[in-house]
């Protein structure tokens, strides 16, 4: 008796949904990159310039972290899709062996 139940079609559907979520997130981050990394100082004083530079640095760091997170997300989606295919192939092989 198996204690693990895997439904390949559900894994594949989850991979598709996660792929869509990842693409939307990447697009949103790309759209936010220019306005957040190019913060214009509100005034011509030194404090405003330093504050704007500080915000721009944080935005650049966010973009870097987001790119790494997107890469990890893509690897996870690929692994999930591959697992769905593997489970489906195993089910077919087990059904053929049982016949």
From Swiss-Prot:
Subcellular location(s) per record: Secreted, Cell wall
InterPro entries: PE-PGRS_N (IPR000084)
Pfam families recorded: PE
UniProt entry tagged with the keyword Secreted: yes
Upregulation: Expression is positively regulated by Rv0485. Induced by different stress conditions such as surface stress, oxidative stress and acidic pH stress.
GO cellular component, one term: extracellular region
Keyword Calcium among UniProt keywords: no
Ranges where the PE domain occurs: 1-93
Keyword terms, alphabetized: Cell wall, Secreted, Virulence
Function: May play a pivotal role in the interaction between M.tuberculosis and host. Can enhance the survival within macrophages under stress conditions such as H(2)O(2), SDS and low pH. Increases the production of IL-6 and IL-1beta from macrophages, and decreases the secretion of suppressor of cytokine signaling 3 (SOCS-3). These changes probably involve the p38-ERK-NF-kappa-B signaling pathway. Also precipitates the macrophage death.
Family recorded in the similarity comment: Belongs to the mycobacterial PE family.
Protein name as it appears in the record: PE family protein PE13
Organism: Mycobacterium tuberculosis (strain ATCC 25618 / H37Rv)
């Amino acid at each position: 008796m198996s204690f693990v139940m895997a439904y390949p079609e559900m894994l594949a559907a989850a991979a598709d949904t996660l792929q869509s979520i990842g693409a939307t997130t990447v697009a949103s981050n790309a759209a936010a990159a220019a306005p957040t990394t190019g913060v214009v100082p509100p005034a011509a004083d030194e404090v405003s310039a330093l504050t704007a530079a500080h915000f721009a640095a944080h935005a650049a760091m966010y973009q870097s972290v987001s790119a790494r997170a997107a890469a990890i997300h893509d690897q996870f989606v690929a692994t999930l899709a591959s697992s769905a295919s593997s489970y489906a192939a195993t089910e077919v092989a087990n059904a053929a062996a049982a016949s």
